């Protein structure tokens, strides 16, 4: 089935809707139309939809199972993780092979040598992915007199294209200033003269720079000329080749709602595979478990109180 919003003429949702029977209500029941769906439209990323639906078209076994597989998010998760891991390994190897980069980033997150490089690359990619979700909300590149939500939803790639046109380093000229001088620095009305638009101030720590004392001055090691020289535009071309192929959705999948794309929960799964949680004494809690906790904990609290619980 196809669903659309009359106020949004550019996008629509292609959903797999199944019919069952509700014996309690004694009537037919239909699945949530948002469950197992592709978001398509003029500016949508269609690579995943095209590949998975084409696979179903080509198969000789036309059945409900193969149709459900075409609308499954699992292949996207595995494919994205494999490509994301490839980006991580390539950048880590490139930086680790450079002795100056090893020295500059030594001490990153309290780590040394290659472990420090790995931590830097994880955070670099994590920051970029986070900004993909942020730009999807229209919070980047917002015109000066417009509200948040009206920004450029392709802000990062647009900026990267600008760096290529000007033949300048994307990392040095745009990405580092975006990280450390815009997102991590408060400006009047959030306006950035470099980007000629509003950029939100985020003080959660994700965009804090790794610094060292050099000749009595605090220097940002992440924007060091040595790191800027190693990370050239070809590295970011590879990153955007991957990220621009997928639909980033700001809605997390739930047991009843699975949009075929990259969502915050999937990002958690990616980091779970890349990061050694045991050594860091951390744990990624999956969305379905959070849903259960949100239901069970209030019920338990009410049960223990003097007031009897109500449904």
What is each residue range found by the language model?
Residues 1-311:
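Preference for the N-terminal adenyl/adenosyl cofactor-binding alpha/beta module
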């Amino acid at each position: 089935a196809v669903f659309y919003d009359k106020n949004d003429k550019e996008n629509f949702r292609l959903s797999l809707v199944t019919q069952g029977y509700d014996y309690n209500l004694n009537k037919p029941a239909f699945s949530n139309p948002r469950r197992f769906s592709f978001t398509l439209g003029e500016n949508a990323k269609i690579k995943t939809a095209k590949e998975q639906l084409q696979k179903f078209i080509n198969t000789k076994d036309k059945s409900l199972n193969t149709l459900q597989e075409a609308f499954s998010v699992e292949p996207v998760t595995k494919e994205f993780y494999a490509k994301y891991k490839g980006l991580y390994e390539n950048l880590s190897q490139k930086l680790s092979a450079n002795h100056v980069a090893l020295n500059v980033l030594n001490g990153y997150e309290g780590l040394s040598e290659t472990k420090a490089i790995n931590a830097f690359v994880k955070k670099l990619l994590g920051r970029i992915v986070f900004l993909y979700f942020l730009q999807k909300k229209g919070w980047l590149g917002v015109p000066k007199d417009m509200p948040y939500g009206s920004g450029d939803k392709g802000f990062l790639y647009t900026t990267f294209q600008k760096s290529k046109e000007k033949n300048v380093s994307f990392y040095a000229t745009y990405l580092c200033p975006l990280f450390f001088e815009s997102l991590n620095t408060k400006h009047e009305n959030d306006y950035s003269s470099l980007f000629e638009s509003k950029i939100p101030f985020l003080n959660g720590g994700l965009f804090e720079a790794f610094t060292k004392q050099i000749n009595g001055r605090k220097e940002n090691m992440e924007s060091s000329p040595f790191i800027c020289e190693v990370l050239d535009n070809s590295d970011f071309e590879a990153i955007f080749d991957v990220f621009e192929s997928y639909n980033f959705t700001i809605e997390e999948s739930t047991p009843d709602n699975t949009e075929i794309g990259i969502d915050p929960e999937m990002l958690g799964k990616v980091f779970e595979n890349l990061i050694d949680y045991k050594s860091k004494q951390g744990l990624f809690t999956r969305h379905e478990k959070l849903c259960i906790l949100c239901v069970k904990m209030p019920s338990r609290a009410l049960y223990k109180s003097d007031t009897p619980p109500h449904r």
